Curated annotation (Swiss-Prot):
Catalytic activity of the protein: L-leucine(out) + L-arginine(in) = L-leucine(in) + L-arginine(out); L-histidine(out) + L-arginine(in) = L-histidine(in) + L-arginine(out); L-arginine(in) + L-phenylalanine(out) = L-arginine(out) + L-phenylalanine(in); L-cysteine(out) + L-arginine(in) = L-cysteine(in) + L-arginine(out)
MF GO annotations: broad specificity neutral L-amino acid:basic L-amino acid antiporter activity; L-cystine transmembrane transporter activity; neutral L-amino acid transmembrane transporter activity; peptide antigen binding; protein heterodimerization activity
GO biological process terms, semicolon-separated: L-cystine transport; neutral amino acid transport
Keyword RNA-binding belongs to the record: no
Region Disordered, annotated ranges: 1-20
Annotated gene: Slc7a9
Extracellular topological domain residue ranges: 56-62, 138-147, 194-217, 275-302, 432-434
Topology in membrane: Multi-pass membrane protein
Annotated protein name in UniProt: b(0,+)-type amino acid transporter 1
Assembly description: Disulfide-linked heterodimer composed of the catalytic light chain subunit SLC7A9 and the heavy chain subunit SLC3A1. The heterodimer is the minimal functional unit. Assembles in heterotetramers (dimers of heterodimers) and higher order oligomers; the oligomerization is mediated by SLC3A1 likely to prevent degradation and facilitate heteromer trafficking to the plasma membrane. Interacts with CAV1.
Subcellular location: Apical cell membrane
Length: 487
């Protein structure tokens, strides 16, 4: 059998080079520092450098703008603490997927994987790489817009590079993440220190009467939260690689408690720094807030800002790829995707098929280029699944009392997150109804067709098609099923 011969070949190679033989499964290569870097590196992408104006546009004053940024950080921390309980109770990779499976059964878990793998994850990956490409191209096309084909080709190259790095080695992917996280923290520190210097010099005009003209409508507040929480997106990413964390019972909660508050403090201080240099009107008119800040504060070294923003975006893309590949891997292992997507590289011990699949889908999303609106309308779906997952935590407090809980958050924390999730789901639909929200719901529910056709009933003709495809891909990529499932 093919997988047996592949395993035997690997064992022969290992016996020649080393006395230690690792099982063909995901290895625990991610420590506390790498875990913190994954959280910080995935959350801090391009958003805080480019579009803090979105929060200001909906609050219309400085004071509430800063409060929204702080509140979003607190909400992300509360949500992550709930995920810490889930992640130490159910130590499987895949983020929300195994938790929904355990709490509500296979159908909600499948709909989450269907929506995430086809739209949410790869389109976000594509957008981050397009943002990276635009910043790099801007350095070579000064004063004019770079050709769309150049931007798309460079974005595709970035996707190929990141996918290759993560398919080659878990340790290499972690190392790249650590390097880019360090690089983005440099520019964060430069902006914060510059802002504090200006603040100490008495540039506090924009903070006087900071609540004047505040927008108080429910719709505007919900949109401000949406934009703020978009910049915090990634707070749950460490739960996607729980099986690869060393000592997850300690490192998962510690990485969350250190990483997300660190990001929150950085975001608030960066916004304060922006307001020491720009008036609210100037900030709203800026195309890229951090670049405008750099032009005014760092000239003639203002080129540093777009360079480090590019580093920041590529780091966020790497973190997204690193974690999202594990969702595909776990979905394949549960039979909710092609089985070959759950296979492990014999030589590299990485989920190479899942990562390659993810990269291909992301490149497809680059072709149309304008996919921001798609992600905007699916962002409410993200909070639908966040809310369902944390509801599952509450449900399992009563239905699965047998599960060991190394971490147990007070019950009011998941209840708060569930209520906020419900507000974020319903508020934009009620305030500004749009057909796109209905299309999004219909797309999610369309996953039921594929579930019953290919997962529940497992028609023979589908098996006859998938079996030879799996066989040839397995031999081509030298991958085998994991030797054991996590417990």
């Amino acid at each position: 059998m093919e997988e047996t011969s592949l395993r035997r070949r690997r064992e022969d190679e290992k016996s020649t080079h080393s006395t230690e033989l690792k099982t063909t499964s995901l290895q625990k290569e991610v420590g506390l520092l790498s875990g913190i870097c994954i959280i910080v590196g995935t959350i801090i992408g391009s958003g805080i450098f480019i579009s803090p104006k979105s929060v200001l546009a909906n609050t219309e004053s400085v004071g509430p703008c800063l409060i929204i940024w702080a509140a979003c950080g607190i909400l992300a921390t509360l949500g992550a603490l709930c995920f810490a309980e889930l992640g130490t109770m159910i130590t499987k990779s895949g983020g929300e997927y195994p938790y929904l499976m355990e709490a509500f059964g296979p159908i909600p878990a499948y709909l989450f994987s269907w929506t995430s793998l086809i739209v949410m994850k790869p389109s976000s990956f594509a957008i981050i790489c397009l943002s990276f490409s635009e910043y790099v191209c801007a350095a070579f096309y000064s004063g004019c817009k770079p050709p769309a084909v150049v931007v798309k080709l460079l974005a595709a190259a970035a996707i190929l590079f990141i996918t290759t790095v993560n398919a080659l080695s878990v340790r290499l992917g972690s190392y790249v993440q650590n390097v880019f996280t360090a690089a983005k923290m440099v520019i964060v520190a430069i902006i914060i220190i510059s802002g504090l210097v200006f603040l100490a010099q008495g540039n506090v005009k924009n903070f006087q009467n900071s609540f004047e003209g505040t927008q108080t409508s429910v719709g505007a507040i919900s949109l401000a939260f949406y934009n703020g929480l978009w910049a915090y997106d990634g707070w749950n990413q460490l739960n996607y690689i729980t099986e690869e964390l060393r000592n997850p019972y300690r490192n998962l909660p510690m990485a969350i408690v250190i990483g997300i508050p660190l990001v929150t403090v950085c975001y608030i201080l960066m916004n304060i720094a922006y307001f020491t240099v720009m008036t609210p009107t100037e900030l709203l008119q800026s195309q890229a807030v951090a670049v405008t800040f750099g032009d005014r504060v760092l000239y003639p070294a203002s080129w540093v800002v777009p360079l480090f923003v590019a580093f920041s975006t590529i780091g966020a893309a790497n973190g997204t790829c690193f974690t999202a590949g594990r969702l595909i891997y776990v979905a394949g292992r549960e039979g909710h995707m092609l089985k070959v997507l759950s296979y492990i590289s014999v030589k590299r011990l990485t989920p190479a098929p899942a990562l390659i699949f993810y990269g291909i889908i992301a490149i497809i999303y680059i072709i149309p280029g304008d996919i921001n609106s798609l992600v905007n309308y699916f962002s409410f779906a993200a909070w639908l699944f966040y809310g369902m997952t944390i509801l599952g935590l509450v449900v399992m407090r009563f239905t699965r009392k047998d599960l060991e809980r190394p971490i147990k958050v007070p019950l009011f924390i998941p209840i708060i997150v569930i209520l906020v999730s419900l507000f974020l789901i319903l508020a934009p639909i009620i305030s500004e109804p749009a057909w796109e929200y209905l299309y999004c719901v219909l797309f999610i529910l369309s996953g039921l067709i594929f579930y019953f056709l290919f997962v529940y009933y497992k028609f023979g003709w589908a098996q006859r098609i998938s079996r030879p495809v799996t066989k040839h891909l397995q031999m081509l990529m030298e991958v085998v099923p994991p030797e054991k499932d996590p417990e």
